Amino acid sequence: MPLRRAVFAILFASLGSPLVAAETPLRLERLERCGDLLASERQEWCLRVRGLGSGLPRLLLDGRELPATALRREGDGLRLRLDRRGHASGPLWLEQGGRSSNPVWLTLNGSHVLAAGPDEVAKNMDGLTTYVDLVSLLIEENHDGRREAERLADKYGARVVGAIPPLNLYQLRLPARDLVQRDALVLRIGSETSVDAVVVEESAPEKGEETEAARRPVDKPDSDSDEWAANRFMDAVNYYQRRVRARQAPLETRPVRIGVIERDVDFDAPDFADYLGPCKAPAPRTCLYARDAERPDNHGSTVAGILAARWDQGGNSGFLRGLDRASQGFQVIVERNSDAGITANVAASVNLVEDGVRVLNWSWGIHRVGARDVDGDEVDSLVRSGIAMSGYEELLEEFFLWLRKEHPDVLVVNSAGNGSSYSGTDEYRLPSSFVTEQLLVVGGHQRSERQGLAVDDPAYAVKRSTSNVDMRVDVTAAACTHASTLERDARGEVHCGTSYATPMVAGTVAAMLSLNPRLRPEEIRMLLRRSAMTIGGDYDFEPADAEDLTAPILPSERGYRLDHRDVGRSARLDMQKALDLAVKSRERVR
């Protein structure tokens, strides 16, 4: 017995030693506004940290240490009080015991909304989870939004708890205990002349666009299939490296900031392990800012990995990471604001745009209840009720109107969806159905089983069976990729969906902007379509079954040649040629 006690004493002593503590990873899992979300000058932030030792850690914002007096320990979490004066938005990370956490982007902009807790939701008549007492009001633009929201809150016994001020949107907590009371209040508030729309949130926050239609089995390519070859991924990396650093005529590039609307990334995976702490290197490099995830194969890790994963570690390989040593660096910011569904996605997007993002990756989308796929069956993937869809439509319309007015150089890249349905039917699919020059819609393809074809052969790739289609889709890209893993040099599971085609295009757009930052959204779309390879048959602009993969290639996109073999076919991303046209656009004046 004395010997056993001695062994346990040594074991407990070793667990409490600094050496063991130093081996425990420090991870920042949550960073959200708390307290008064409407306060702009003095802000409160709540942090949840894994691996936090005793005492307070060092907290650094964009490389500057924040005073210890601004930080308070709350169990396993921290509360930060930050004075906006003297600070700017930037990466925030912790240091303790020789360890550095993952950096997370902290925005000082004022768009934040609350997510409902588990006791604040209910099932509606469609069987969908909906918020009981939290709704958002879009106030008419001729009113002072904050003042009018406060007036309406007083009138109906509610409280203003969140806001997206640039869109004149304010979130109210209603005095409603069930959906009958909520719907009655929504009808009354919606009839106010100052209210443009009421946004009712229906949220399934743990799911993104990652799930393909579950009601039919879908074949995935073999794990050793080089899906990205169909978009000339390696050719594009090689071209960028050689052309930018060419001895005869080197190119000057610019840094680009990309926003990815996702929840988190697993920094325990080898793909992302070297992004911990400050993003410093002798030369500019790709930086990644995100909350830490529990699993390496989650949606956010896979989407972000296509842009930023470290090479030769197994799992994924990031396109922008492959441009290091030639580029001036890319900042990839993974941000979701909160788990308040579509409203939070828009709030995060507004903050990121105000923080200088040029490209937004939206690997998400929703279908209305009752939407039909190309076979006439009902879509059961990511559906929302009619009342929610009408509010979302108004919210997204306000976002794109604001984007066109205040930030006309920003481009949103959006997934077409995985419902085997139509992307352009505005009454059934959002946001891909919006027609605006600042929204690029991406469909998905995979390698065909035919052997010996040239990469530019239209039959080299085929449409992913679950990918949404029609003429609103601008271009297709590889829909299948490998997930990240916890094991070094291990091959991850194959994940498929238009979610993963979207960052292929977003990364290409970011690289194009680094080569020519003067490119406008409509010019980027034109260059992507002019450079595109083709996929599918030649339908002479009108497929017999009305299933356009993308908008057909036009003669104007092929030098006005009516007899060009590409005319009438659908567009498949050519990453290398798109970069080449971006370089040539530096000298051309239209």
Where are these regions (language model features)?
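Extracellular S/T/G-rich loop segment that most often corresponds to the catalytic His/Ser-adjacent loop
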Residues: 262-264, 429-514, 518
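Subtilisin-like serine protease catalytic core
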Residues: 125, 240-344, 355, 369, ...
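C-terminal subdomain of the subtilisin-like protease fold in secreted/lumenal serine endopeptidases
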Residues: 357-362, 438-439, 516-590
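Protease zymogen maturation seam
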Residues: 112-128, 187-257, 269-271, 372-374
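Substrate-binding/access-modulating region of protease and related hydrolase catalytic domains
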Residues: 334-434, 488-503
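A short glycine/threonine-centered beta-strand motif
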Residues: 41-54, 63, 132-142
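Surface-exposed, short loops/turns at beta-strand junctions within beta-sandwich domains
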Residues: 83-89
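Beta-strand/beta-sandwich contexts
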Residues: 22-57, 99-127
